[in-house]
């Protein structure tokens, strides 16, 4: 059975009625959760906010791109927007909370804003508790240039994504497991990622200390390959402690993204 501290609260799901909210963060920290993950996107004015998708519904049900709205307008847009927190406010809440051992997996969805996000985490003295996560190699290369040696985690598909995924994502394919430094530096308002046929290779493999892959695409061979150089493997997502237990027995990976509160209740020490 996985340990309590191996479970990652995925967007604070199960701890509040809506994901990625301050209420969910507070509830997860209050419960003693030791790893939380949240996503950062950037508004038109360059403000990092906490949300996963590249767009959201306003109070009238209209979908608006996060990259097209100004941060000052979020509360007035209603709908999903009124629940969105500035990354600065969420990090301040983490820093002020007595749960001082919870690790932060900060998943950056837009590239070209790494210095701003890094500065916010540094402002709240949380760098030592942070793993930088992204589906965008642009983000990870840039973050390593800013702060060499920081923990980096690449999220990637390790089996060919299906039509449903490709409908919503730009899918890039690694050649021979290698993802070289991309020429582009700015990725704003896009949903994209990389398919790596098997384990990562090359420069990016040397830089990352973690990878995150879909739970349904895990294999023992993939995990064993990553473990050869102590690269940690996490998988998303699970709804029960039993599912985590079964997956750990089959694959031997290191961390488990949870979309529910139940695993934390079962595994709480």
Model-derived features: positions:
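Phosphate-group recognition and catalysis centered on beta-loop-alpha active-site segments
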Residues: 1-269
């Amino acid at each position: 059975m996985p340990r309590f501290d191996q479970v990652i609260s995925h967007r604070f799901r199960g701890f509040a009625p809506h994901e990625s909210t301050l209420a969910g963060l507070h509830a997860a920290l209050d419960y003693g959760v030791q790893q939380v993950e949240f996503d950062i996107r950037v508004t038109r004015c360059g403000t990092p906010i906490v949300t996963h998708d590249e767009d959201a519904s306003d109070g009238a049900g209209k979908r608006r791109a996060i990259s097209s709205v100004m941060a000052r307008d979020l509360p007035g847009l209603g709908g999903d927007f009124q629940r969105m927190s500035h990354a600065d406010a969420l990090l301040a809440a983490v820093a002020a909370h007595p749960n001082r051992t919870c690790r932060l997996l900060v998943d950056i969805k837009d590239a070209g804003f790494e210095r701003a996000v890094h500065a916010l985490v540094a402002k709240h003295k949380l760098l030592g508790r942070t793993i930088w996560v992204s589906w965008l190699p642009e983000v990870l290369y840039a973050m390593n240039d800013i702060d060499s040696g920081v923990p980096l985690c690449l999220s990637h598909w390790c089996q060919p994504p299906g039509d449903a995924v490709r409908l919503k994502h730009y899918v890039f394919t690694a050649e021979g497991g290698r993802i070289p430094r991309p020429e582009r530096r700015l990725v704003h308002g896009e949903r994209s990622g990389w398919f790596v046929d098997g384990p990562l290779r090359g420069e990016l493999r040397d830089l990352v200390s973690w990878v995150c892959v879909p739970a349904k695409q895990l294999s023992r061979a993939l995990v064993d390959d990553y473990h050869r150089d102590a690269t940690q493997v996490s998988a998303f997502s699970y709804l029960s402690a039993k599912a985590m237990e079964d997956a750990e027995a089959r694959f031997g990976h290191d961390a488990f993204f949870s979309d529910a509160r139940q695993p934390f209740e079962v595994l709480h020490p």
